[in-house]
From Swiss-Prot:
Official protein name in the record: Glycine-rich cell wall structural protein 1.0
Function: Responsible for plasticity of the cell wall.
Region (Disordered): 231-252
GO cellular component term of the entry, any: extracellular region
Keyword NADP tagged: no
Origin species: Phaseolus vulgaris (Kidney bean)
Entry keywords, A to Z: Cell wall, Cell wall biogenesis/degradation, Repeat, Secreted, Signal
Length: 252
């Protein structure tokens, strides 16, 4: 009788131990699954404005990073922007400005027809294209990053742009265009204002010896841009027929 009680007690003890181990293993498995899914953060993208609207918010890069597709705009819309790795900056409609990319550059948006100054965004490490002016717009210049970027754009009344840190900005084409101002080590002389007529011929800088030409015709509006260093900033857009905003913003 005593032997049966001892045997039964041992069997019950073994079952209790198995139950405790099984419960602990289940809890650990659930915790691992939760930890596997938590922390996956996806970068969003910013929206464009409506008629006369401003820019959207900033795209975010966390870990593997999201993407930075910039939104286009309607009439007078604001800018989009790109996250690290590039993407397109948002183009404006009438009078809209554009946003720049981050580490991989990207395209800065240009001003539309009737717009004022459009601010094109430059890349932090990869340069990028500056914004171009539209018909009647006071053209948007592009700011380069560590690499050179292109300056102002085309169109009647388009102005020049600022050069990058190591490269000059190109001048605008079309009537009343001004040249692009040079960068720290680059060329690109400022465009002249000697009356109306043929557009400016501002040159590409891109080095200590680089020089830009001077153009005849009225001076256009210069622009400058901002890209984020790691995340993306955004460029503000102007209203229809008005001046644009400027780039900027830093989102770590």
């Amino acid at each position: 009788m005593a032997t049966s009680k001892v045997l039964l007690s041992n069997v019950l003890f073994v079952f209790v131990c198995f139950g405790i181990c099984s419960a602990a293993r289940t809890l650990l498995t659930l915790e691992d699954r939760v930890n596997l899914h938590v922390g996956t953060v996806v970068g969003g993208y910013g929206g464009g404005g409506g008629s006369g609207g401003g820019g959207g918010g900033a795209a975010v890069e966390l870990g593997g990073g999201g993407y930075g597709e910039g939104a286009g705009g309607g009439e007078g819309a604001g800018a989009g922007y790109g996250a690290a790795g590039g993407g397109h900056g948002g183009g404006g409609g009438n009078g809209g400005g554009g946003g720049g990319g981050a580490d991989g550059g990207g395209y800065g948006g240009g001003a539309g027809k009737g717009g004022g100054e459009g601010y094109g965004g430059g890349g932090a490490n990869g340069g990028g294209y500056g914004g171009g002016g539209g018909s009647g717009g006071g053209g948007g210049g592009g700011a380069g990053g560590a690499g050179s970027g292109y300056g102002g754009g085309e169109g009647s009344g388009a102005g020049g742009g600022y050069g990058g840190a190591n490269g000059g900005g190109g001048g605008g084409n079309g009537g009343g265009g001004g040249g692009g101002s040079g960068g720290a080590h680059g060329g690109g002389a400022a465009g002249g204002g000697e009356g109306a007529g043929q557009g400016a011929g501002g040159g590409y800088g891109g080095g200590a010896a680089g020089g830009g030409g001077r153009g005849s015709g009225g001076g256009g509006g210069g622009g400058y841009g901002g890209g984020g260093a790691r995340g993306s900033g955004y460029g503000g857009g102007g209203g229809s027929g008005e001046g644009g905003g400027h780039g900027g913003g830093y989102y770590p």
